[in-house]
Amino acid sequence: MSKEFDYIIVGAGSAGNTLATRLTEDASVSVLLLEAGGPDYRFDFRTQMPAALAFPLQGRRYNWAYETDPEPFMDGRRMECGRGKGLGGSSLINGMCYIRGNAMDFDGWAELPGLEDWTYLDCLPYFRKAETRDIGPNDYHGGEGPVSVATPKAGNNPLFHAMVEAGVQAGYPRTEDLNGYQQEGFGPMDRSVTKKGRRSSTARGYLDQAKKRPNLTIVTHALSDRVLFDGKRAVGVTYLVGDSEERVEARARKEVIVSSGAIASPQLLQRSGVGPRALLESLDIPVVHDLPGVGENLQDHLELYLQYACTQPVSLYPSLLWWNQPAIGAEWLFNGTGIGASNQFEAGGFIRTRPEFKWPNIQYHFLPVAINYNGSNGVKEHGFQAHMGSMRSPARGRIQAKSKDPRQHPSILFNYMSTEQDWQEFRDGIRLTREIMAQPALDAFRGREISPGAHVQTDEELDKFIREHAETAFHPSCSCKMGTDDMAVVDGEGRVHGMQGLRVVDASIMPLIITGNLNATTIMIAEKISDKIRGRKPLPRSTAKYYVAGDAPVKGKALREVKQA
């Protein structure tokens, strides 16, 4: 194998696979793609069956299984922080919800100095480029992209429809497309699943078309040790293969692109000598470039579940029983249909809890079964739940390498629930969710409130429940943010400030977290920056219309109003 390439990409995840595929469309360009995990085994139902999404989080084959430091505002809990490991990265283990964020998120990015070409209308063409939606393209959706997007179909679970109707009856808008003209409101939720009912990871969508190209070299089980520099220029990478302690060196003629995700990208930069001077010196790491923002500005989405018993036998509870699972698996394996072919997040919504929020600050995922996201603590009866989470918390955390050892996980602290806004949003969110769940559309299905339980009413009782039960939505981001201020790490093209030949391209470069799931936006970022790297003209700006709430009320009058503490 040649040890010199034009580009070295560290991380074959949502961004890295997109970059590798686009860069190698130019036959004269050579790319080395390094991935610490293994292949995305297509026979492994745990990653390929949409309904099995909880399984990869339960082990370490596909999951880095990071843990936070004790979170000071969450009763000192060490909280789960799963990230994908293997070809596809977190697109190999995520919940497959295809949500792009709100148009106002990107317009907000573009208001920051140096990010003027990140408006929603600049980004929308790249969302479309990446996507093939099963019902065809329009102004908002693509029809020829690598990411297969499935829309909910007639005849799916009646609880999805009842939950959307309940949201509308509670006074919120109805939207036909959470990724279209109007995100705000309740409606069907798209998912990154192929027409044959398989997970549409970036390994399947992007690498499958690129991996046979002679100018792309993929090395799995390759854990990057550090980036190599000649002065301020990145010239290569050293990495470990498997359990070996021997460093392998590869050289980059043009650039090293770090696409290791919001946890591992800042850690790799720090181990390589790019980061806050005081941290590097405390670890005896020679300082290549003092860049204080590396690992700072860390953001995430926190969420919790409101669970209800279901009085009709229409939930997915029977699918949790082992004796029903062989038939579900067989239908999925041979036909690509049935319960196994969906992630079962086919309805959701976005709302504003208070007028001061100019676009939605709460997201809902509806699930027709009562169970934890990671597959634990399944309620042993028919039930359903709403996942409710805040979208743009003011809380900021950080990532810090603990040593030079690439196998040692970093110190992670999100500072969840560290601001008064966090507590207000979650209290409001729980109370508004209860009002939604009390609407007539759910009368035929709604039993008792299982969690938190109807007895949990006061601010103090709600706060206790939040501290004990809120958990990550697995959306870490913003730890190597784009921008020009003193804490920015990269510019609007992903180039690391003060360095040459070094970029970061992944969810870590978001300056502010978006309103929704991160995967589609991470892919969009890589699509957009790949054109920059290739020296191509950007795709023409979209002219699509999009909704701005303006002075519109947060909600209308609920059909059934609910008195709460």
UniProtKB/Swiss-Prot annotation:
Keywords: FAD, Flavoprotein, NAD, Oxidoreductase. The keyword Oxidoreductase applies. InterPro entries: BetA, FAD/NAD-bd_sf, GMC_OxRdtase, GMC_OxRdtase_N, GMC_OxRtase_C. It comes from the Bacteria. Pathway: Amine and polyamine biosynthesis; betaine biosynthesis via choline pathway; betaine aldehyde from choline (cytochrome c reductase route): step 1/1. Residues 182-203 are annotated as: Disordered. This is Oxygen-dependent choline dehydrogenase. It comes from Pseudomonas entomophila (strain L48). The lineage of its organism: Bacteria, Pseudomonadati, Pseudomonadota, Gammaproteobacteria, Pseudomonadales. The gene is betA.
